[in-house]
């Protein structure tokens, strides 16, 4: 299969080899590596953890890729964080595809995973396949993610048999928040066995990784030991193979009450707020633009 855009030598080279060259200087920088799904499994086997963040546009994607984030998720959380909806339910395929396209065009190394939004895959494996094909063809996504456990195994199997890598999502599934009674931890007590069974079912159906959201840490640890595919936690403790957060939460662009599982690494809201105030003050005071900004 041929991509719709020209690929760089770094992208077409085998993982870790970089572009062909006659001779590499001893102090040459390490070659750029394109992360593939099997590399995440290899990292799990080595006991090496990996990071995943959401991304919805060019500059965040480029920055996170430069930082070495292995996986970027074009999440249905764009519904809240881009389109200002209260939940993830309203966002559509047609809204997410341009975001996924922008992210995939902007990275050189990260694996780009696109969420399948609510209502675009639940009806049948055939519906799931047709939706996923759009993300792969129109957005150049590298993989897709869908929510659900054992009941979604036919969809996962259909996609993987059709050549589309699938990341599963179990535990608390935001698209089912009304059915689950709101934002609640999943897998406590007797329900723990079901979380393990769902992860095993996703692996058997062909998923290359599984996200666990709002699952007790000991249950997530048991899942991680029970499957050979990587586990990715969001509110699922330290023993997962990788972690994922919504970037606006992690870096303080969104304000207000944060979920317990969020650690904020920056206060981007404060930085942008002050910068905007400084800009407005300069304009009102007549000090911008100055001579150095004028032709």
UniProtKB/Swiss-Prot annotation:
Origin superkingdom: Bacteria
Residues at the catalytic site: 213 (proton acceptor)
Cofactor-binding details, from the entry: Binds 1 Mg(2+) ion per subunit.
UniProt xrefs under InterPro entries: Pantoate_hydroxy_MeTrfase, Pyrv/PenolPyrv_kinase-like_dom, Pyrv_kinase-like_dom_sf
Pathway assigned to this chain's UniProt record: Cofactor biosynthesis; (R)-pantothenate biosynthesis; (R)-pantoate from 3-methyl-2-oxobutanoate: step 1/2
Region of interest (Disordered), ranges: 1-30
Names of the cofactor(s): Mg(2+)
Annotated keywords: Cytoplasm, Magnesium, Metal-binding, Pantothenate biosynthesis, Transferase
Coiled-coil stretches noted in the UniProt entry, renumbered to this chain: none
SUPFAM superfamilies named in the record: Phosphoenolpyruvate/pyruvate domain
Protein family per UniProt: Belongs to the PanB family.
Subunit comment: Homodecamer; pentamer of dimers.
The name this protein goes by in its record: 3-methyl-2-oxobutanoate hydroxymethyltransferase
Lineage: Bacteria, Bacillati, Actinomycetota, Actinomycetes, Propionibacteriales
